[in-house]
Amino acid sequence: MAVGPTEGKQPPSESFSPTHHQIIAPSPILAVPTLAFSAAQVEIVCKTLEDSGDIERLARFLWSLPVALPNMHEILNCEAVLRARAVVAYHVGNFRELYAIIENHKFTKASYGKLQAMWLEAHYIEAEKLRGRSLGPVDKYRVRKKFPLPPTIWDGEQKTHCFKERTRSLLREWYLQDPYPNPTKKRELAKATGLNPTQVGNWFKNRRQRDRAAAAKNRIQHSQNSSGMGCRSRRADGAASPTPSDSSDSDISLGTHSPVPSSLQLQHSPGSTSNGANDREESLSVDDDKPRDLSGSLPLPLSLPLPLASPTHTPPQLPPGYGGGAGAGPGGPLTGPGCLPPFKLDAATSLFSAGCYLQSFSNLKEMSQQFPIQPIVLRPHPQLPQSLALNGASGGPPLHHPAYAAAYSVECVPGGHGPPHPPPKLRINSPEKLNSTAVAAAASVGGGGGNQHHEPTTTGYHHSGQLMLHRPFSTSPELKHSAPEIT
């Protein structure tokens, strides 16, 4: 016996009236209604729901899409659908699916901003969960370096100074045309670069400030370079200009700087034109064997040091009868006859007295190396008796003693008889000959006055009042009562 009614057959023992409804079992294919949406319609719906921010409805819509549709592959590869799926995965916390969607599909530049933000924020959230704290700027920078943007949502253009290189190049072009754009140009430039007018104005302000600083720095460098070139040119001119030290190798005359007699002109040999210092020193040698006329032409600094050459100082005078009395009056000129101290002139001292030194600071080093200045030592000599001083005191013996004449080669004739004689010509021998001959003269003349004791003084004057000047390191004999040297 049949339990239930068979399909298409009436039960044999029961009859149904025609008014009864037939029960039809539903087909499993027709259980869910089919959505006849095209790919364009699905894209529009996804964009609308994404822009509205209703993520739940967007998620339900994506879930309701049929899988067996013939155009399902085209719908799933649509950029709007992929972006909607990425937004839903980000909001539900399914970051693995978000990374897969972004890395495996190429997007256009219109989707770069949103997808880049979701990529970075997803990595920030994961890093915060791992570290258990919020991330700082440095931590976020490290995350960005560890997980760079994939090329599917990034064109590879680096950001420099907060702007892309393309934006900066466009701003530079506009800046070269007009560094002070008006608001209208700022708006146009902002529209062309994708920035706002405030950003454009700030960039122009910063660029103008940088240019002003660079211009000031360039001006300082230019002034320094010009001053350096001027110094070098002045040095070159100073080296090329004729100076008394290197003007002419044939004949160097010192008479143009100070009244030095022509007998002290530095004679150069014809072959002394080499550039070496030794040749120059040889060419500046002075003949020591010729008598020289040193009367009245030596400048004051050669005769006395600076403290003794003051106008208020009265130098020691000659006896009234010597040399016709020229320059012997009190307060008379120091350059008169007979006031020449016994010291030796060398090339360096002659150049110094002639004013060849310190012509300019540019050749100071070269001149000091070629002609070193030797100091003059003031040393009293009590071994010379009072009668043998060159400018002896009045009442002493005459100056024509044969031993004295042999020591100093002075042609001395007592004054006061006959016409005045020319100033004496002094031949200056070496310190050894001078001192030894002078000591012999003192022994022959002083004779019994050897026991006479002369008290040493601390000044540069001899006990007779005459200033004695000698070359340094002279070979004068050591005396018991000699005064200390004054340099």
Curated annotation (Swiss-Prot):
This is Protein Optix. InterPro entries: HD (IPR001356), Homeodomain-like_sf (IPR009057), SIX1_SD (IPR031701). Residues 255-277 have a biased composition (Polar residues). Residues 182-330, 443-463 are annotated as: Disordered. Residues 278-293 have a biased composition (Basic and acidic residues). One of its GO terms (cellular component) is transcription regulator complex. GO terms for biological process: compound eye development; compound eye morphogenesis; compound eye photoreceptor cell differentiation; dendrite morphogenesis; progression of morphogenetic furrow involved in compound eye morphogenesis; regulation of transcription by RNA polymerase II. Keywords: Developmental protein, DNA-binding, Homeobox, Nucleus. Residues 154-214 bind DNA. PROSITE patterns: HOMEOBOX_2. Expressed during early development of the head. First expressed in a band around the anterior end of stage 5 blastoderm embryo, at 93% to 85% egg length. By gastrula stage, site of expression shifts to the dorsal-anterior region. At stage 12, expression is found in the clypeolabrum, the stomodaeum, and in ectoderm dorsal to the future supraesophageal ganglion. The gene is Optix.
